[in-house]
A protein has these predicted regions:
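Hydrophobic, Leu/Ile/Phe/Ala-enriched alpha-helical segments that form helix-helix packing faces
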Residues: 47, 96-98, 127-136, 255-273, ...
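Extended helical coiled-coil dimerization/tether regions that scaffold
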Residues: 181-313, 317-334
């Protein structure tokens, strides 16, 4: 599933806004106050139509048994506020188009700003019916939907008893893969508890499995095939081996899927590998608060997930969250769907900013990503020249610039390999540090040549603030300044 277009009317920051999206990566950039957060929340709200439980739409719902799933309606503060008239809009609308199982979906979430008003279900009924028909067909995949706020994963959601009971089940309800999918807080502790539970159940099985395998091997080495068939002890050993295998298989498959996804993700992050954070294996560590996920790395070190550096912890947590949702929804099948990451560059070293988006795209190749960023490293390392392989002449990735007062974003040209300073200057409306320094130098020399001592000192102080008092460039500036001083 992916979302192709959105058309917003009277929602929060926007009087009107519309945008078209690419199937792989959509990077949102722009200064604060341009509406990036509003657009992100509009996308999330639009996608929630699949969780309708309105009885007028039928009897079969994805939300069945999970009261956290529903269509996201509009709150009073969601209606656009006109600062000139000091009035809220009388209605709000988010229209969207998308594709699920090659079916074109068109829907609208519309609500009037009156007491007790509700969403007009008729405006998303056809899309919902089409979606559910595909979703409920035999062997169908369900799309991943996930949102990661700029506070993720540092604000945890509480795990109450009912949720704990669910994650401790051997077989989890399929729609639990959508649990708190759009929440500001993190489900990391939830998946961590689940993963540790699986690991803890596996660990006691290794010793008897190894013992049985050894006994089977000894008999097979010493007896003929005919003797083995007549050997009652051998038959019992084979039965026990099958029992242990069947018990361990679902546990192993689940743990291995998450482990392999995180391993794959790290393989696309050279800096993480260079620092020795290649995963060797997971294990569960007992603490006063219960089991905690410990990661053993190939360099011999180990760390609790929660004790990793902030940037690594966020990336690992997002990768684990996506992987777990995918596994619960579709087992080991590569899932499609939509993932939204606010401030993808948060807490990251520049070397990681350059590759983080591509790492997510390579690890989860069927997903459509929406990410916001202020990092020039992110946008200048995304190849937006690639086109779809399905024959359609459509770009897979794009960078969208949002500006104040505009009703749609600007699509940037391919910036892959473009000089960072040029990107800052020409496309992010931000002067590079080098350019800013040059402008200050020129002004400083001009004031010196006019013998404006106070003004020149003020500019020099700004240079100090920009480069630091120990910067080598200061010596060059001081030497050149002598040529401009009035004697």
């Amino acid at each position: 599933m992916n979302i192709e277009t959105i058309n917003i009317t009277n929602y929060r920051y926007f009087k009107h806004y519309e945008a078209s999206f690419c199937p792989k990566a959509n990077v949102l950039i722009g200064r604060n106050g341009t509406g990036k957060t509003t657009l992100i929340h509009a996308i999330i709200k639009a996608l929630s139509f699949i969780f309708s439980n309105d009885k007028s739409l039928g009897k079969d719902f994805l939300s069945a048994g999970n009261n956290t799933l529903n269509v996201k309606s509009y709150n009073t503060s969601d209606f656009h506020f006109n600062q000139e008239t000091r009035e809220y809009s009388s209605e709000a609308s988010i229209k969207a188009t998308g594709i699920f199982y090659e079916q074109q979906l068109n829907w609208e979430l519309f609500k009037r700003n009156t007491p007790k008003s509700a969403l007009y279900t008729s405006l998303y009924k056809d899309a919902f019916t089409s979606f559910m028909t595909s979703a409920k067909s035999e062997n169908s995949e369900w799309p991943i939907l996930a949102y990661y706020s700029d506070s993720y994963p540092h604000v945890y959601s509480r795990i109450n008893k009912s949720v704990l009971d669910v994650i401790n089940q051997d077989i989890i309800p399929r729609n639990f893969g959508y649990y708190q999918w759009d929440d500001e807080s993190a489900c990391t502790s939830l998946w961590e508890a689940r993963l540790c539970n699986r690991i803890a159940k596996m660990q006691p099985l290794y010793t008897p499995a190894a013992r049985v395998a050894s006994a089977i091997y000894e008999k097979e080495e010493s007896l003929t095939q005919k003797e083995l068939q007549a050997d009652a002890d051998y038959q019992k050993l084979k039965e026990e081996d099958n029992r242990l295998t069947e018990t361990m298989k679902p546990l192993y498959n689940e743990v291995n899927y998450i482990e392999q996804k995180l391993t794959s993700f790290i393989s696309h992050l050279p800096k993480v590998q260079a620092e020795g954070f290649d995963i060797d294996y997971f294990f569960a560590t007992q603490s006063e608060e219960g089991y905690k996920l410990t990661i053993n790395f190939k360099n011999g070190s180990s760390s609790l997930l929660q004790d990793l550096p902030a940037g690594y912890r966020r990336l690992f947590s997002i990768a684990i969250d996506i992987a777990y949702r995918s596994y619960i929804l579709n087992q080991s099948v590569e899932s499609s769907g939509v993932v939204v990451i606010d401030e993808i560059d948060l807490h990251l070293h520049p070397a990681l900013e350059q590759v983080v988006l591509n790492a997510f795209m390579e690890t989860f190749p069927q997903l459509q990503f929406f990410v916001s960023t202020h990092s020039v490293s992110v946008i200048s390392n995304l190849d937006t020249s690639k086109t779809s392989t399905d024959g359609a002449d459509k770009r897979e990735n794009q960078i969208l610039v949002m500006n104040i007062g505009e009703e749609q974003p600007q699509v940037l040209p391919n910036l892959l390999g473009v000089d960072y300073n040029a990107v800052l200057r020409d496309f992010m409306d931000t002067p590079s540090r080098n350019e800013e320094l040059k402008n200050l130098e020129d002004l400083y020399y001009s004031y010196l040549s006019m013998d404006l001592k106070n003004e020149s000192q003020t500019i020099y102080n700004q240079i100090l603030a920009l480069v630091g008092k120990d910067a080598k460039v200061l010596e060059t500036i001081q030497n050149k300044a002598k040529e401009y001083e009035v004697h």
